[in-house]
Amino acid sequence: MRHRKSGRQLNRNSSHRQAMFRNMASSLVRHEIIKTTVAKAKELRRVVEPLITLAKSDSVANRRLAFARTRDAEVVGKLFTELGPRYQERPGGYTRILKCGLRAGDKAPMAYIELVGRPEAAQAVEVEAAE
């Protein structure tokens, strides 16, 4: 029985899932909008929102925590220099999920996940996880 177990398995083992969400979080921070499946977008929200909350208070300890979770120095820099100050007054809810139909190959429900208040120049990037 799976009573009270949170999180989706997404047909992956735990290390694959962790690596996939680490990569997707880095892509979302870098591009500010990505296209993925609805289930992955909903799970990605649980990874990215705490990172942005962490970036709202800049300290060496918080930067090290963010680096431990993303393993990407460029992403950590953007989190603390751009995104943290941008969302300083917002108490959570930094992402938006917009459903965009079904994928052509397997009819999987697709969605854009984007950062709220992003510059309009940012273009969507498709993220395809290893399947």
Swiss-Prot record:
GO terms for cellular component: cytosolic large ribosomal subunit. PANTHER family: LARGE RIBOSOMAL SUBUNIT PROTEIN BL17M, RIBOSOMAL PROTEIN L17. It holds the Pfam family Ribosomal_L17. It comes from the Bacteria. InterPro entries: Ribosomal_bL17 (IPR000456), Ribosomal_bL17_CS (IPR047859), Ribosomal_bL17_sf (IPR036373). This is Large ribosomal subunit protein bL17. Part of the 50S ribosomal subunit. Contacts protein L32.
